[in-house]
């Protein structure tokens, strides 16, 4: 770890196309090898597909999907006297959002066939409807935290 001061957090600017901070964060997570324009196109196409299928505002659905996939608690490993305990801890809002976006992108990539924009649109629609792999992952995370509640006093 660096001995210097922690890097200053830079504010996330809203995306010029969608005027939304979450969209900017999603584009950053989608991007591979610095190809930002490709990531922007994938997100725009996914929003287009969502608009076609639902007829609603894709930005609202996207925000709902992220909210539904955001974990409130997680378990972190803590070593105490030779034993490693899974200690449940609350997740800060910023980290929770980052985890939700990461899960949405990863599970979209893991879906079968079709283009990335179609897979992303499907995952976002599932997450907005409290279904899909990203929401299931959040539920698993919450279950793990619940199961290890006895070690909550080891929090740091």
From Swiss-Prot:
Q: Which GO terms describe its molecular function?
A: rRNA binding; structural constituent of ribosome; tRNA binding
What start and end residues bound the annotated signal peptide?
Answer: none
Q: Cite the InterPro entries for this sequence.
A: Ribosomal_uS7, Ribosomal_uS7_bac/org-type, Ribosomal_uS7_CS, Ribosomal_uS7_dom, Ribosomal_uS7_dom_sf
One BP annotation, GO:
translation
- List the GO terms this entry assigns under cellular component, sorted alphabetically: small ribosomal subunit
One Pfam assignment: Ribosomal_S7
Q: Note the superkingdom of the native organism.
A: Bacteria
- Which SUPFAM superfamilies has this protein been placed in? Ribosomal protein S7
Q: What keyword terms does UniProt attach to this protein? A: Ribonucleoprotein, Ribosomal protein, RNA-binding, rRNA-binding, tRNA-binding
Known function: One of the primary rRNA binding proteins, it binds directly to 16S rRNA where it nucleates assembly of the head domain of the 30S subunit. Is located at the subunit interface close to the decoding center, probably blocks exit of the E-site tRNA.
Q: How does it assemble?
A: Part of the 30S ribosomal subunit. Contacts proteins S9 and S11.
Family indicated by similarity: Belongs to the universal ribosomal protein uS7 family.
NCBIfam families reported for this sequence: rpsG_bact
- State the protein's name: Small ribosomal subunit protein uS7
Q: Specify the species.
A: Prochlorococcus marinus (strain MIT 9313)
Gene label: rpsG
